[in-house]
């Protein structure tokens, strides 16, 4: 029997489903937000203040990229006060997330149920979180006692090591290299691409697969859109909030994958489950699958077979 290998990828939608207000919009509307409309310290603060007033969905990292991108018509030279303010912004986000993760969680949330099933399954030896929160603390609050390992992709608030910023393929104006995530002193390499390549099954929960993080997943989705045999297909389950986010996610996949959506869907066991008004049949099938395809079930089957042979 081939060794099973499963991967869990966690995005901010996971923490939001727990009941925490961890979106950038939530941060921008909190008392921790260091941006002020009047008396801005630097052009970066002024730019963020303008954007927060006009954009319904406030994607902080995309706005940082937009501000520092090469070719903007104003502020061509890096302002010396921008970097200290960026550090202040990052520290403020750290304090905000810390106070959010100190709150209780919704123990009946889909996020908790999925985490319990994943940990109990036993084959998820690769768990990655793009969030800054403590997954062990979440597990304890959820009543999960089994041991598991996971990796932070962008640091964590517990170690004051969060990484915010922009991708490495966007050309930035001179002097704004500090905004690149891969340039952060806290950045650590990880084998996420290899784990995705080698796994039989992957579960995404609450990750938008947006272009800022898409380089982590680009090779995986490209490969799964060019399967040459049935055995190359994988089980891919994506948990997202609602139908609006489902369509956004599919559109993002289509754009980033050169329009190769049909092969991706047909050559893999791809399911998208919405956490608001979910398809209960689809949800139950997911949980039943993880229970059936688990280390415990396989051990029970082997023990049963051994007893029959004696």
Task: List each model region and its residues.
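Conserved catalytic-core helix/loop/strand module for nucleotide-ribose chemistry
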Residues: 2-8, 12-201, 207-310
